Design a protein with these regions (language model features):
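Immediate post-signal peptide segment of exported/extracytoplasmic ligand-binding proteins
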Residues: 2-18, 38-46, 122, 144-156, ...
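Extracytoplasmic "Venus flytrap"
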Residues: 15-32, 52-57, 203
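Soluble non-cytosolic domains of exported or imported proteins
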Residues: 24-28, 55-59, 111, 159, ...
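Extracytoplasmic small-molecule ligand-binding "clamshell" domains
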Residues: 32, 46-65, 98
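Contiguous mixed-secondary-structure segments that line small-molecule binding/active-site clefts
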Residues: 34-38, 66, 76-175, 187
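Alpha-to-beta junction loops
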Residues: 43-45, 61-75, 173-176, 190-198
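Short beta-strand-to-loop elements that line the ligand-binding cleft
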Residues: 47-56, 158-159, 174-187
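Pocket-lining segment of extracytoplasmic ligand-binding domains
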Residues: 79, 164-166, 174-205
Length: 205
């Protein structure tokens, strides 16, 4: 902590909720944000983090932020499309060249693309502070290995709320089961779904 920071009375306390585990890749981004915000304001601003969906999943947290009931929340682009349909462009398969991903995030966080998105998000009472990469998502199953596209036929796959994700699952002859990330572990244990659409970093956590 900066000198005197631990003794300074916070003038503003901002609650930041998300559905990730504390050690998820994007969660570490939020921890760093908290550290810098408190440091740069000399302790006048305190960021209180709520992880593991204790205040709700992406949709609930974003709706709460939109209404002003919550100061900040983390939301994946797959759920952001519920509030601003154009955000679904990020869910299209192969739309982002991996070799240009760094340039994309630079434009999102520091350039014209981020400014453009915020101009439109403002119309639905939202504003993006930062875009974090949580790695590409993959199909994973708990009942049988995925050896080829034929292996996916008939699999009941947990997907996000994104219409793009669900249409892709149907195109691959799976049965999509859209649900929030916070529900995934339980439904896999219960056998309600056969697999999940998830990033490798989230599988690890």
């Amino acid at each position: 902590a900066a000198p005197g920071l631990s003794h300074a009375a916070a003038k503003y306390t901002l609650r930041f909720a998300h559905d990730g585990a504390p050690d998820a890749v994007y969660s570490l981004t939020y921890v760093k944000f908290k550290e810098l915000a408190e440091q740069k304001t000399g302790g006048k601003v305190k960021i209180k983090l709520f992880d593991n969906a204790v205040l709700g999943g992406d949709r609930v947290v974003t709706e709460s932020t939109q209404r002003g009931d919550l100061e900040m929340g983390g939301c994946g682009t797959s759920n952001l499309g519920i509030f601003w349909p154009s955000a679904m462009a990020f869910d299209l398969p192969f739309v982002i060249d991996p070799a240009k991903k760094a340039a994309l995030y630079d434009s999102l966080n520091n350039g014209r693309l981020g400014e453009y998105l915020n101009e439109h998000l403002a119309k639905v009472n939202l504003m993006a502070l930062v875009y974090a990469d949580c790695s590409n998502r993959h199909y994973a199953t708990s009942k049988k290995p995925i050896k080829d596209l034929a292996s996916l036929k008939g699999v009941k796959m947990r997907t996000t709320a994104s219409p793009v994700d669900n249409l892709l699952a149907e195109t691959l002859r799976m049965t999509p089961a859209p649900m929030g990330f916070a529900e995934v572990y339980t439904v896999l244990q219960q056998g309600t779904v056969d697999g999940e659409l998830i990033s490798l970093s989230d599988i690890k956590t």
